Regions:
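Short acidic (Asp/Glu) and glycine-rich catalytic loops that position anionic groups and cofactors
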Residues: 1-4, 46-51, 222, 268-272, ...
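N-terminal intrinsically disordered, cationic/polar leader segments
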Residues: 1-10, 15-17, 25-29, 35-42, ...
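Catalytic-core signal marking the mid-to-C-terminal active-site face
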Residues: 3, 10-23, 31, 36-43, ...
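Short beta-alpha connecting loops at secondary-structure transitions
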Residues: 6-9, 273-280, 308-315, 342-354
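Generic secondary-structure signature for well-ordered alpha-helical cores
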Residues: 22-33, 49-52, 70, 74, ...
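A glycine-rich phosphate-binding loop feature that marks nucleotide/adenosyl-phosphate handling sites
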Residues: 40-46, 262-270, 307-315, 344-348, ...
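Helix-rich catalytic cores of soluble enzyme domains
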Residues: 107-336
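Metal-ion/cofactor- or nucleotide/acyl-coenzyme-handling active-site neighborhoods
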Residues: 314-328, 332, 345-373
């Protein structure tokens, strides 16, 4: 017999979420969203239940919204059904230098390769961790995918990937590489709160409609800036924007499936008015996650929380406290996928050593919540009776057989006493994490097949010479 799972209860109930859903449907039908793209407007205009008004405002009847929700598809990989998932990275431009502890630097190609290898060694998913700023801008996203395909089993290869494809030409190179490498390809559209889109982003999506690629919708309203000041009001706007955006995709992208991105599902960002900064890891952002999880269940969206985000600038006590509390409370609510591991300063910095510590924190929580058996065998009544008063269990057969599985043996959070720690060099947690990160990178072995690698090289060499690709990144 198993012990009952530990859980946190409370928060949004079904009646309250029904009300938010009704509000979102009303907003879709009576307020609408701005879609600044004539080609997409023309497609939408052909549907009954779509109303196009001046200024490219589009409104959707509730039945179209409900159909979009019904037809949404979430191709969660098999490993995500059994494992705790860590998504590591969101294309940062600054990182900590593993060879010079504490030194911040601009990310380069070598950092991209090393962090991809590190993430693969830790079984992480998600997008490329850093942007190689030593590479021309029009090649950066192509190289980020190429390196991920070549050196990682899961990175840029499942529903947890969320990288931009900044131009149609760039998207097509990545699409071609994904086919060669046998990797997943999808295109994402970001809504710009409140209720609008970037015209260029829509143009890329429009040109991809005949390619049969999955498309996802995401939005990130900011409380008090691009959405109401209350977090619950911001979440209400987020639900509206997600439902409207998904409906648009479901009507225009009929050659493949569409979905709400689990990476930012029902997002609502907290914003500090004193410093004008995003405050991931804050009390308010954790509050957002407590709204997000039940809404994901309500709409059947896979749960992925940003519990690994912190506003701390270094791998320090603040970072550990924010991430530890956020991870534990969301895990108690049922989350088993955690995003943004390795990020510091609310996403401004990437840190390989912090990724290693993030993994340890998640493993810590996982071991707290692992299923526990309640049985006569585990109560050990006979053992208690067999050991006389003042005796010891240390030499008992049961102790020898079970101590390794009864205790978690952490990689970083070691249980040494003071003397043992001093004999081991008195290293800080930061240094332990750096050493482990470098060791994992050195020992990493996965590489894509040679034949596929050669094809990827050819595609990348062609991209280097493509003037049209380069011009697509120019700002006139």
């Amino acid at each position: 017999m198993k012990l009952e799972d530990y859980k946190v209860t409370g928060g949004l109930n079904k009646e309250q979420m029904d009300k938010m859903h009704e509000n979102a449907l009303w907003l879709c039908e009576n307020v609408g969203i701005n879609i600044p793209h004539q080609g997409i407007i023309n497609i939408l205009s052909s549907y009954n239940g779509v109303k196009v008004e001046s200024g490219n405002y589009v409104k959707f009847k509730p039945e179209l919204v409900m159909n979009a929700l019904k037809e949404a598809k979430y191709d969660v990989p098999e490993y995500a059904k059994d494992e705790w998932i860590i998504s590591a990275g969101a294309h940062q431009t600054a990182c900590y230098d593993l060879d010079n502890p504490g030194r911040l630097k601009e990310a380069e190609e070598k950092d991209l390769i090393n962090f991809i290898k590190l993430g693969d060694a830790l079984d992480t998913v998600g997008s490329a961790p850093v942007v190689p700023l030593d590479i021309p801008a029009h090649l950066q996203h192509i190289l980020m995918h190429k390196v991920a395909y070549e050196n990682s089993r899961r990175r840029c290869n499942d529903i947890y990937e969320h990288m931009d494809k900044p131009s149609y030409e760039c998207a097509m190179y990545i699409h071609e590489m994904a086919k060669v490498a046998g990797k997943r390809f999808a295109f994402g559209i970001w809504m710009i709160s409140p209720r609008s889109f970037d015209a260029k982003n829509l143009e890329i999506a429009y040109k991809l409609l005949d390619k049969g690629v999955p498309m996802w919708i995401a939005t990130m309203p900011v409380a008090g800036v691009s959405s109401p000041i209350t977090m619950i009001g911001t979440i209400q706007q987020s639900v509206f924007e997600y439902l409207a955006g998904l409906t648009m995709l479901n009507l225009i992208n009929r050659k493949s499936f569409n979905y709400i991105s689990p990476n930012d599902a029902f997002e609502g960002d907290a914003f500090d008015m004193k410093y004008s900064t995003f405050i991931y890891g804050s009390v308010e952002y954790t509050e957002h996650t407590l709204y997000q999880i039940p809404l994901c269940r309500y709409y059947n969206v896979p749960i992925m929380t940003k519990a690994a985000l912190t506003n701390s600038k270094q791998p320090d006590g603040q970072a550990a406290a924010e991430i530890g509390m956020h991870t534990l409370i969301t895990a108690l609510m049922g989350a088993r996928a955690f995003r943004c591991a390795g990020l510091l300063s609310s996403g401004e910095i990437y840190s390989g050593e912090w990724l290693v510590i993030n993994k340890e924190i998640v493993d810590y929580v996982k071991n707290i919540l692992k299923p526990q058996e309640f049985s006569e065998e585990r109560l050990f009544i006979d053992e208690i009776a067999a050991v006389k008063a003042g005796g010891s269990f240390i030499g008992r057969k049961s102790t020898m057989q079970l101590f390794r599985q009864e205790y978690w043996m952490p990689e970083l959070f070691t249980h040494m006493n003071l003397g043992q720690w001093q004999e081991a060099g008195s290293k800080s947690m930061w240094q332990y994490a750096i050493d482990r990160a470098k060791k994992l990178i050195t020992r990493h072995t996965y590489q894509i097949d040679d034949d596929k690698k050669k094809e990827l090289d050819k595609i990348y060499e062609a991209a280097k010479k493509d003037k049209k690709l380069e011009d697509s990144f120019r700002i006139y």
